[in-house]
Every structure is written in C-alpha cells, then in structure tokens.
C-alpha cells in the first residue's frame, strides 16, 4: 500500500489549480471533501487509460469522476445515500441534451401538489406559492434508479439552499443560508426571526436549467474536457463488502489504483448536516447517521479520551486494507488521505496499531504530512 510515493507528491499536485477542473466536481458542496487536483495527480502518474480506479469512501465522487473523465473506469462506493446519488450521477452521466429533454417533460407535466402536510422545518425555507410546490413535485416525480433523473436530483441537491447575492437574487431555492451544510431546524428558525429573513420566489425549473448549463460549460481547459470520459460504476455498501463485490464482478487483482479518504475518527453527522438534501431524496436523517459510520458500536462514545473509538477505527482500517490485497494488481498503489484529530497523528497511530495487532498484507511505502 502506498500513502505517498515520493516526498514531493504533496507539492506536485498543488501545481494544478482546483478551479481549472470540470464544474461537475462542484455539483454539490460536501463535508470533508478533497480537491480534484489531488486524485488527478495520482491517477495521471499511477494509472493508465482503461485501468480501474477505486474509491471505497467516494463522498461526492471526486476520485471516481476524475478517473472516468481521464478515460479510466472510475468506481465509487459510499453508504451515504446523498454521496451515492452524487457519485452515481458523475460516473454514469447522461447526455446533456437528454437532461434538458427530461426537464422539459417534467416542466410540461407539472401540476401543483398540496404542501399542507410538509413539515414546518421545510416550509420555513421556501416560497410556498411556486418554489416549494415545484420541489415537492420533483421530489415525487424523479426516480433515483433512472440515470437522467438521478443526475437531475444530484444537481438539485446543489441548489437546495445557499447564500443570496447583495441585490437579493440567488441561484439557490431557499432563504439566505449556508450552502455547504444545513444547521439544525431550530437554529435556522431562530436565525430567520433574528435577521428577518424572507423567502424569495424561485422557479426551480429555471434554476435547474441554469445549473445544468453551468455544470457542462467548458472553458477549453485540459482538466475540464470530457472527450475521454468513460462510464464507471458506484456501489452503496460497507467498504469491506465492496472489496468483495469488486472481486466478484471485475475479478481478483483487477484494480490498478485506490485513492480515498476514510471518514474522520471524530464522527461527522453526514445526515444531520444534510437533512434538507436528504428530505429531497426521501431519506431519514437518523438512518443515515446510524449507517454511515465505519465503527457503528462507538457512536455513543464522545471525545477521544477513551481508546475504544480509535481501536475500533484502526481495527476496521486493518481489515479494509487487507481486503484490498485481493483486488489490487501487483505493483499497484493505494493512496489514503487521513485527517488528523487534534494533536493525534492518526495515520501513523493507525499503522502502528495495525503492525502491533497482526500486521497488514499490504506494504507501507511512506506517510507524509500535508495540508489540504
């Protein structure tokens, strides 16, 4: 296994400007994501066209999409239904013209649906004469199993909420609020009262059309074009189970490269901070936060004073790394981005734990520190 091959790798990937990459990467903001120039560097130097590139914790699909864009078979996996929706939309992209065609059909068939039974947590965010009825219609009309509908849903998650411009207009559907994550309903409710926030009447179909146009807009930069794009795949499984799935579908030792960032040791509530987007996807917040964890049994333990959370994390990572032994090709690489917690060097501590508790089938080449 390779966490970093050369001492210059952290510097080299930063030569590529993150804003020069395809806007598809920016479809929806996502917590704890790394920039596209990072996987681009590793994909460029440690794989070739038609190779399989895998990310078992794909998040919004940065590694998997960049691999597909570069002519590789990008495979993503994530238990978070929002992450699954986003990654799937990027590794199995429909044609732009087909997206517009579907939007036109949805617009023509639009009929206002009663919003009487929608929770106040949602109604406080949106205009109730046009915006919320349209959102509710799309929520019930779009089928996540259909790749065109899934892409539209993914794009819509990116404009569900966000900031307003100084002139009072917005590219988002909601009141003036952050875009990256959602504060709690009670916090938002009090914030609305405190700042006298008002809802703006937004045509969701128009916003979606503008968003789609922006996502596919190219500026003739090499990191944006989709000329070499090829279809990939996405799973919604536990990461270790996904290794077995890949071996079954693609064969033993079929993966050339892994670039991933496991969930932080300090638990991030992906459901809680995305409750508005999960409402759109018909997903329950509690179920997401219960499922999206690599150490379920330590959810109730807060802080890092007790060793149990770390040991559970490190033990899981050991089993995960060993599962990669069967899917990685000989002389292939796995780059693992691990975020430190406070003063703890999590990467080094995890590897030391693994070595002291049975070892790993993969070889560690290097551990380098870098600020992303």
Spans of features found by a protein language model:
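Class I S-adenosyl-L-methionine
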Residues: 342-343, 360-372
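SAM-dependent nucleic-acid methyltransferase catalytic core
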Residues: 135-260, 265-268
């Amino acid at each position: 296994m390779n966490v970093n091959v050369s001492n210059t790798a952290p510097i080299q990937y930063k030569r590529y400007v993150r804003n020069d990459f395809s806007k598809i990467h920016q479809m929806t903001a996502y917590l704890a994501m790394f920039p596209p120039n990072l996987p681009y560097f590793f994909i460029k130097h440690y794989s070739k066209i038609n190779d399989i590139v895998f990310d078992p914790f794909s998040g919004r699909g940065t590694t998997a999409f960049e691999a597909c864009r570069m002519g590789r078979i990008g495979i993503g996996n994530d238990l978070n239904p929002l992450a699954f929706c986003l990654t799937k939309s990027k590794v199995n992209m429909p044609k732009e013209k087909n997206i517009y065609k579907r939007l036109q059909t949805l617009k023509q068939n639009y009929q206002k649906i009663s919003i009487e039974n929608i929770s106040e947590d949602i109604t406080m965010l949106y205009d109730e004469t046009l915006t919320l009825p349209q959102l509710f219609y799309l929520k019930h009309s779009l089928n996540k199993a259909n790749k065109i509908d899934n892409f539209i849903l993914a794009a819509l998650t990116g404009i569900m909420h966000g900031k307003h411009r100084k002139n009072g207009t917005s590219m988002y559907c909601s009141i003036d609020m952050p875009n990256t994550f959602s504060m709690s309903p009670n916090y938002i409710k009090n914030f609305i009262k405190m700042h006298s926030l008002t809802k703006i009447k937004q045509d969701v179909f128009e916003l979606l059309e503008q968003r789609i146009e922006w996502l596919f807009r190219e500026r003739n930069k090499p990191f944006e074009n989709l000329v070499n794009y090829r279809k990939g795949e996405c799973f919604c499984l536990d990461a270790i189970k996904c290794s077995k799935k890949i071996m079954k579908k693609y064969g033993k030792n079929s993966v050339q490269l892994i670039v991933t960032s496991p969930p932080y040791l300090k638990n991030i509530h992906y459901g809680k901070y995305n409750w508005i987007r999960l409402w759109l996807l018909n997903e329950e917040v509690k179920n997401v936060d219960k499922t999206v964890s690599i150490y379920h049994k330590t959810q109730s333990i807060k802080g890092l004073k007790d060793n149990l959370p770390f040991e559970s994390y490190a033990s899981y990572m050991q089993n995960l790394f060993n599962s990669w032994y069967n899917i990685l090709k000989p002389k292939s690489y796995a780059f693992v981005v691990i975020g430190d917690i406070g003063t703890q060097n999590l990467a080094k501590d995890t590897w030391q734990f693994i070595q002291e508790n049975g070892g790993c089938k993969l070889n560690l080449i290097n551990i380098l520190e870098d600020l992303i």
